[in-house]
Amino acid sequence: MMYAFAAIAWLGFVVHNVADLPGQTLISSETLWPTAVTAVLLLLYAFGPRRAATIGILAWAALHFMGGIVSVLPLPFLPFEPDQTLRHYSFHVLYALTQVPLVAVSWQEVRRPTTRA
């Protein structure tokens, strides 16, 4: 489930960036670097210290979830480009909602008791 939900979360992020932000592509730094972080966390989850990777995935997904919400608030330190329209807000709703399954599954895994050999 972790991989499927990570793919959904990543897709929501990419759709937000490429479809809603002016001039963004899959290789724009605003998309490429977060994609690399996601890939590294999933590689660590698959082959490295799983608990630490799960905590990292949880933090990363929570950051994306909060970013999807906070970045549309009218805070003076945030740039408002593109314009804050219903279309833009709908992309943020999509972006935030696609993070929820990954937050939930990683939270459940972090809370699962660890077994000692």
Set out the residue ranges of the language-model regions.
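Polytopic alpha-helical membrane-helix bundles and their juxtamembrane interface segments
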Residues: 1-117
